[in-house]
Amino acid sequence: RWLGWQKFCWISCLFSSISSGLDPGEQAKVTTALDTAQFAINAINEEYIAQAKAIEEALKVSTQARSADLLRRQTELAKFGSKVGKALKAVQAASAIASFVFTFFMPSELDVITSLINERFNEVNAKLDRIDEKLDEMEKSIKADTAFNVFLSAWIKWEYKVRNGAKKLSDIRKAMGTKTQRIDQVKLAEEYVKYYETNNLDGNVLSLYRMAALPESITQRNIFDRFIAQFGCDITKLSELMILVQNIMTSAGQQKLTYYYFKGDQSRANSSFKDIQMYFFKIRQGFDDRVWHCRRNSLDYAKRDANKILKNMRGSSRESIVRAIFNELKVKYPWYTWAVAAVKSDRPRIRGLELRGSTYFRLEDRSDAKKVKGYFVVYEDTRSSASCSDITQAKTLLVFKKCDGCNSDYIYAADNILSKKRCGESTLERLVDFKQQCPVCHRWPYSITCYCANRVKQDSQNMGLYCISSQHH
């Protein structure tokens, strides 16, 4: 409330100083323009701070993080990518400042601009510049990935034109806040109009919209489709791309509306904002559709990525291959938790330990036809839970002999996927049906054949058996 009172006093002081030069209608227009800009800027500032934090967390993702934490971060970032309202508010804020310039500085009969008006104008303008700086910080963080940066440079060729236009507009606004003569304000506005036209910036908004929302004529892909084709269905990176597209679109939209206001064409500025609004919603729809596509087809993409790693790492140690596949799938597709293991082709013949369930897939390295190397990949919904005590109820159970020379590091499993490595030596033993496996021993318990049960126990504990189970529903 104190801030609101301070703001009221500021505006009151402002217009008591200039009331002799402005009629009530002009005063109302100036008040509306500045207040609209102030309101829009304040509304989006906190959102951009939260978005920057989400990006920072996403970029610090570690393979040591829990799957649930990875999923939370990715979901939060995707939500920010889908929120175009804040971008539209940023466009409106710049539009309101341009409207203020047109309404007061440009057609005003006052030759002298009071220092108090300039001070208020600079205050609002500085807040808008700080938001632009925050957008630049987010962009630099995202584009620290070299491959990401190369992709953007190839597909957003006019990005630098937009960035240069934003710098020019910022410089013009700052200069306006230092001038006390109306004619100087007019000259600055004319300078920007000429720059905008000379550099052909008017087509940037439409070009960006077409690239992001509409399929390209030959390949029938937009920028999100091309990104998925090159980087796979990584929703974290896809969300970062959407945020970059939003930021560029926001800047281009601010420049476009400012151009029309500085030209004195308020009607065209209003219609252009409606177009920009539609463009943002269409781009968001394209992004949301691709996120849904990635979620729906995540297992297919995971299989493709795992096979690609296996192909690229032929000749590497099996332990390093298992670790690479596990880390890739864990970070890229966190709505599933994963387990990966290197195995021998033969399985133990113990009743009760038969392969069951379907939430897994098998990879094979056939580079050596005489010695096929097998890998199991098991997955589970991250939101479900499992513990060692649940193993008898497991929906998917894989029990296999470890590969020759393997040690415990040849199995990597997420926190809520069970493995013998984590659940203790008696895990598999609890699943064996000893009456079926050793029927003679159970009919004649004092017979010498009773060594069977001990042998089965030893097999399940000491022969290098591993199990991966999933509670997938």
From Swiss-Prot:
Keywords: Coiled coil, Secreted, Signal
Coiled coil ranges: 40-60, 116-147
Secretion signal, residue range per the UniProt entry: 1-21
Protein name in UniProt: Cephalotoxin-like protein
GO cellular component: extracellular region
Tissue specificity: Component of the acid-insoluble and acid-soluble organic matrix of the aragonitic skeleton (at protein level).
Cellular location(s): Secreted
Domain of life of the organism encoding this protein: Eukaryota
